[in-house]
Amino acid sequence: MTKPLDGINVLDFTHVQAGPACTQMMGFLGANVIKIERRGSGDMTRGWLQDKPNVDSLYFTMFNCNKRSIELDMKTPEGKELLEQMIKKADVMVENFGPGALDRMGFTWEYIQELNPRVILASVKGYAEGHANEHLKVYENVAQCSGGAAATTGFWDGPPTVSGAALGDSNSGMHLMIGILAALEMRHKTGRGQKVAVAMQDAVLNLVRIKLRDQQRLERTGILAEYPQAQPNFAFDRDGNPLSFDNITSVPRGGNAGGGGQPGWMLKCKGWETDADSYVYFTIAANMWPQICDMIDKPEWKDDPAYNTFEGRVDKLMDIFSFIETKFADKDKFEVTEWAAQYGIPCGPVMSMKELAHDPSLQKVGTVVEVVDEIRGNHLTVGAPFKFSGFQPEITRAPLLGEHTDEVLKELGLDDAKIKELHAKQVV
């Protein structure tokens, strides 16, 4: 089967999550990904949050499928020479070292271009080059804070809240892959590689751009009418005082309010008293208002000017959601979802991780994949999120540390005697 990235050779210097998420996805698409790991220790996540002794952690395996691993001491002259040979054959190099680390190893961009003018050097950093904070190291939750996600997530009477989604790490890796694919396409036109960089702050901000939209609206109008703080006597501060936009100058935390212009809220369903995930998210789409009225048995609201326009009902949104919630008391979240679907109303259940892990539909479509792993035992991972009509990604287990060292060295043209010598010198 022809794969989208067949023939693309990727040198993967990444570790933890942002970079590995990028290179793993390239591996899913058929790229030849060689993970270059520090001799003797490898990617630190191999030992993080282990659920089984003496095997690589799920943290590592779930971000490093479809790769090969080589152990290499890049500080030795022989190690540096091997790396130079690999760069000459590479299409892409991906790294997420701290700022300036690659330069300190002796591999400046200028030197890399001398070795291979067609290679693309892709990097993930905390802040963009030229930013006042470009020297700072950034991890997942720091990125969520720096990019505006934490300040706008959570409830108004609580602290800034980080998301369970990896907005800083995996999201940055996906943005980086987009940049790499664009750079590969541009190389077809120019014949030369280039540097591609993604700042974690930028990647997070890209996903909260609607909050930048709201900041500009707030500065121009003084209010965000769809936010809970605009509802009469609904949102209160920690001292019990009602909140309003009279003294709010930055986009506030809106709880579970919808941010796309269509108001939404999290509503309880049957069983919520004992099941923390017995909720649905219900959206009041303007064009669906008549159907919503039919569903909740409020036909009189269809023609009532106090309800039948967004402007009319915006100051009553929370009261409306509370009323709708009463209709769900005798139905579980899946029954509510099907009920709403009969009217074409956007509504969905809150899916727990347990439910997702064992969802037969997700396994059928290849989103949740059982990885065959004869070393640590079979385990689940998330497959490619995109589906092709002419290509089905095959997910293979993550490599053991240095599992493919000799194989990769032979591809460079080294014979058995030379490989044995490099092992003896502890270069590989």
Swiss-Prot record:
Signal peptide: none annotated. It comes from Oxalobacter formigenes. One of its GO terms (biological process) is oxalate catabolic process. Pathway: Metabolic intermediate degradation; oxalate degradation; CO(2) and formate from oxalate: step 1/2. CoA binds at residues 15-18, 38, 72-75, 96-98, 104, 137-140. GO terms for molecular function: formyl-CoA transferase activity. The gene is frc. Changing residue 260 to A: 25-fold decrease of the catalytic effiency. Reduction of the affinity binding for both formyl-CoA and oxalate. Substrate binds at residues 260-262. HAMAP family: Formyl_CoA_transfer (MF_00742). This is Formyl-CoA:oxalate CoA-transferase. Its EC number is 2.8.3.16. It is found in: Cytoplasm. GO terms for cellular component: cytoplasm. SUPFAM superfamilies: CoA-transferase family III (CaiB/BaiF).
